[in-house]
């Protein structure tokens, strides 16, 4: 039912040699002390910005739409921090995949673990709602060290990278489930598993409702959360990990179980967006603003991106 983490001799083919080289460099890189990794990661992110003009433009537009009350200067400062965080994301991916448990444990603390344990004591599944922070990959590893669970994901097009990322993610978790595998997700929840997923991206018009998100009135929001809730009867809570502002490590936040989740899919979409907004505001400069969150528009409306 779920992807298996099995090595294939095919991965030794020359077409994968460049990927192996990149992975080797990343492995060597993350052997450095964490403060050095932070210094290098933030610098690489800043230096990459001039080469990622399209992504910079997307981030600027997203911030203009979501935070019109902020000055242009404030938003530009957030963009600069966002690109530094993007560089850290590469470092944190290597940390998540290659660091031993003992080293990971030195760099995080947890707030609200009892909330997850209480939800699991109800003998039903738990829908663990996440958001796309730059430290997402490491956050999954950290969450698994606190409480192993399952997670939904999009399979990688490169089969070697698929093996590496699945192997890395399963170092502290139970299984990965393809995000389109509705039967697998619902089945796991009905068996009492905790399953992580992130409903904060634009997945297109099909299966979405338009609901407010920050200052944008109509934002395509997946109905997947609503469908999973109705089919599984699972509890819902959020798990978010942010990088501490002084780069002294990370904090994992686990909120209490959500209450009053709507029975109407449009209201449910608006409800979930409010939850996601609150999580993003823990560290907005670390959120994935380079994603075209507002790509899908209501029929008849023009694109918000030029």
Swiss-Prot record:
Q: At which positions is motif HXXXXD motif?
A: 132-137
Q: In which pathway does it act?
A: Bacterial outer membrane biogenesis; lipopolysaccharide biosynthesis
Location in or out of the cell: Cell inner membrane
What would be the name of the gene that encodes this protein?
lpxP
Which InterPro entries does this one have?
Answer: LipA_acyltrans (IPR004960), Lipid_A_LpxL_LpxP (IPR011920), Lipid_A_LpxP (IPR030857)
Q: What induces it?
A: Induced more than 30-fold upon cold shock. The induced activity is maximal after 2 hours of cold shock, and then gradually declines but does not disappear. Induced in persister cells.
Task: Give the EC number(s) under which this enzyme is classified.
Answer: 2.3.1.242
Q: Return the Pfam families for the record.
A: Lip_A_acyltrans
> Which segments cross the bilayer?
20-40
Q: What is its main location?
A: membrane
Q: Which UniProt keywords apply?
A: Acyltransferase, Cell inner membrane, Cell membrane, Lipopolysaccharide biosynthesis, Membrane, Stress response, Transferase, Transmembrane, Transmembrane helix
From the Swiss-Prot or TrEMBL record, give the protein name.
Answer: Lipid A biosynthesis palmitoleoyltransferase
Query: What cellular-component terms does GO give this entry?
Result: membrane; plasma membrane
The UniProt function text for this chain reads: Catalyzes the transfer of palmitoleate from palmitoleoyl-[acyl-carrier-protein] (ACP) to Kdo(2)-lipid IV(A) to form Kdo(2)-(palmitoleoyl)-lipid IV(A). Required for the biosynthesis of a distinct molecular species of lipid A, which is present only in cells grown at low temperatures. It may confer a selective advantage to cells growing at lower temperatures by making the outer membrane a more effective barrier to harmful chemicals.
GO BP terms: namely: Kdo2-lipid A biosynthetic process; lipid A biosynthetic process; lipopolysaccharide biosynthetic process; response to cold
- Is Acyltransferase given among the entry's keywords? yes
Q: Which family does it belong to?
A: Belongs to the LpxL/LpxM/LpxP family. LpxP subfamily.
Instruction: Please tell me whether the keyword Metal-binding is annotated for this protein.
Output: no
